[in-house]
Amino acid sequence: MNAKVWVLGDAVVDLLPESEGRLLQCPGGAPANVAVGVARLGGNSGFIGAVGGDPFGRYMRHTLQQEQVDVSHMYLDDQHRTSTVVVDLDDQGERTFTFMVRPSADLFLVEEDLPQFAAGQWLHVCSIALSAEPSRSTTFAAMESIRSAGGRVSFDPNIRPDLWQDQALLLACLDRALHMANVVKLSEEELVFISSSNDLAYGIASVTERYQPELLLVTRGKAGVLAAFQQKFTHFNARPVASVDTTGAGDAFVAGLLASLAANGMPTDMTALEPTLTLAQTCGALATTAKGAMTALPYQRDLNRQF
């Protein structure tokens, strides 16, 4: 079993700080990173989205194609530009983002661009695709379509507040997406935002009760991962590494998670979930040991050295 993992959203050119004020061009965008991450782990991934019919867009499509991602539903839009983001790193390798193109081509995806989903497949989405029309309606349609076909939805909000002028709309979109997701991955900050509580145990209980995902994961960086699964709650320790750049850590974690779930199916209990989370955490940790998001995503051979 190696079910297809579709990833819908933005493919972005990240501009990362280099020496003497120079910027390094790197392929990125959380959905594109996840699609590549799954493919590098031997999974079957496809990207659904639009990039500009410009040099950056052609570069991103070529990059994903070279990484063995199915790009048959990755479109070049001559009317709009590819999303471009300046990433700023602090001394600890933590980052902030400045979006240079708005609205970018990815936000103009329409329902006619969607593939025919099939039973057993996965669809992974983030909230940037929900931040504007027509992408918002297209994303919700994709989530409904794959669930109707017998597939599952994975949702990582990956909230970027500066892309939302209306916080009430952000909350409404998050609420709708969370109701449709089988697997939810949140950062600690996102859990606090969604649950309106700094108490993580309360926040997890609140989210699981309201949305009832099959699996809820809360990533806490060096503090590990909290998991709520089959009415049980547990903590998994992080793998200690020397971090250089955290840009792609969350995406690598999701890629490892989805690659394992697509290959092995949903675990039957918390004990069976442990190898999947170990793989996901190892992917996330390895991705912080090099600069860039996509460039740092691990290959299967990198994992083989870890186990």
UniProtKB/Swiss-Prot annotation:
Q: What general EC class does the enzyme of this chain belong to?
A: transferase
- Pfam families documented for this protein: PfkB (PF00294)
What EC number(s) does its UniProt record assign?
A: 2.7.1.4
* A biological process term (GO) from this entry: fructose metabolic process
Which reaction does this enzyme catalyse, per its entry? D-fructose + ATP = D-fructose 6-phosphate + ADP + H(+)
- MF terms (GO), sorted A to Z: ATP binding; fructokinase activity
Do you know which InterPro entries this protein is assigned to? Carboh/pur_kinase_PfkB_CS (IPR002173), PfkB_Carbo_kinase (IPR050306), PfkB_dom (IPR011611), Ribo/fructo_kinase (IPR002139), Ribokinase-like (IPR029056)
Q: Which UniProt keywords apply?
A: ATP-binding, Carbohydrate metabolism, Kinase, Nucleotide-binding, Plasmid, Transferase
Matches recorded under NCBIfam families: PRK09434.1
Record's family? Belongs to the carbohydrate kinase PfkB family.
Q: What is this protein called?
A: Fructokinase
Source organism per UniProt: Salmonella typhimurium
What taxonomic classification does the UniProt entry list for its organism? Bacteria, Pseudomonadati, Pseudomonadota, Gammaproteobacteria, Enterobacterales
